Amino acid sequence: MKFTELTVTEFDNFVQNPSLESHYFQVKENIVTRENDGFEVVLLGIKDDNNKVIAASLFSKIPTMGSYVYYSNRGPVMDFSDLGLVDYYLKELDKYLQQHQCLYVKLDPYWLYHLYDKDIVPFEGREKNDALVNLFKSHGYEHHGFTTEYDTSSQVRWMGVLNLEGKTPETLKKTFDSQRKRNINKAINYGVKVRFLERDEFNLFLDLYRETEERAGFVSKTDDYFYNFIDTYGDKVLVPLAYIDLDEYVLKLQQELNDKENRRDQMMAKENKSDKQMKKIAELDKQIDHDQHELLNASELSKTDGSILNLASGVYFANAYEVNYFSGGSSEKYNQFMGPYMMHWFMINYCFDNGYDRYNFYGLSGDFTENSEDYGVYRFKRGFNVQIEELIGDFYKPIHKVKYWLFTTLDKLRKKLKK
């Protein structure tokens, strides 16, 4: 085996293998994204004795104090069950970094630590991957910990994932809780549609994202941050928009209303109606009253807000391994139409149609108590019967130890001065 720099082609060919469970940050498209952010990129990996790539990682080189922080965002990519391979990688990486002006290195691999069901009950027969964590520590890495909160300096450590293997949309939907099924069906009955946005329409996503940002108070990303991905990831970034055409909805409602009124009139015309028939008439009267109310509201909304209402939108990444929900927004004013539910249902079906076995709702804090900052997000994802995946976390290692001590000391002083 040998540790070496890789070409873009070598790197790309390797990470395209879905069995390696790579992340959307460990793809060739992210090279240009990181370069656009002003960072150099280096591709490092291992080749076996037949010159075949068996490990790969995309590193950003972040200039710091005359040296570089080497950060492999969600790397490296390899068969992490092969502890001997991981051991060799970490040993050889250390040698490489000592020769290439590294201040310290950060790794946050897309590697599983533990697996749970939606209620945070560990899967039977699964064990915590402490062997990997201990292996990193044996190479001098500091573990950032088994965190259970969001941290702006770290990638998420907990995820909610739908395993689609061996399922169909119909069988999968049966595993959702009653609220998820009901709200998806509501959106379908409203006639909510979903389409993918082009780059020149991306402002429609941003409008919904900014509205949600203001409402929820989360840490937002800039427009340029999103456009950087849109411009570099090509067809690996997907932006669905859930919307409703009120003109079509009003027409559908009117047709249904006419049908119910005709049925009611026919039943009323019969003589000697039974109690059962009278109950049916009463039920139809309720439905007619409801539809008339809906028709009036939809007509008024169309006059004030226009016939097309944008309900929800999201940014997704698709790579060889999965489709991953990255970020999204929705309109609170139109939440009756269940736009987010339709968007997720559409994208789940996209996975089935395009051969993906994983639909990743992505981030959770890891605090699943009712007082947690994202308990509502957890409940939403839990309702889809997700499996909860816990990743092994962040690892740091100083390479230039004297300069790293100075760097951390100055950083602590800066933080004290800010306070």
UniProtKB/Swiss-Prot annotation:
Pfam families: FemAB. Belongs to the FemABX family. Homodimer. Interacts with FemA. One of its GO terms (molecular function) is aminoacyltransferase activity. InterPro entries: Acyl_CoA_acyltransferase (IPR016181), FEMABX (IPR003447), PG_Glycine_Bridge_Synth (IPR050644). The gene is femB. Its EC number is 2.3.2.18. It is found in: Cytoplasm. GO terms for cellular component: cytoplasm. SUPFAM superfamilies: Acyl-CoA N-acyltransferases (Nat). This is Aminoacyltransferase FemB. It comes from Staphylococcus aureus (strain bovine RF122 / ET3-1). GO terms for biological process: cell wall organization; peptidoglycan biosynthetic process; regulation of cell shape. It catalyses: MurNAc-L-Ala-D-isoglutaminyl-L-Lys-(N(6)-tri-Gly)-D-Ala-D-Ala-diphospho-di-trans,octa-cis-undecaprenyl-GlcNAc + 2 glycyl-tRNA(Gly) = MurNAc-L-Ala-D-isoglutaminyl-L-Lys-(N(6)-penta-Gly)-D-Ala-D-Ala-diphospho-di-trans,octa-cis-undecaprenyl-GlcNAc + 2 tRNA(Gly) + 2 H(+). Catalyzes the formation of the pentaglycine interpeptide bridge, which is characteristic of the S.aureus peptidoglycan. Adds glycines 4 and 5 of the pentaglycine bridge, using glycyl-tRNA(Gly) as donor. Keywords: Acyltransferase, Cell shape, Cell wall biogenesis/degradation, Cytoplasm, Peptidoglycan synthesis, Transferase. Its main location: cytoplasm. It comes from the Bacteria.
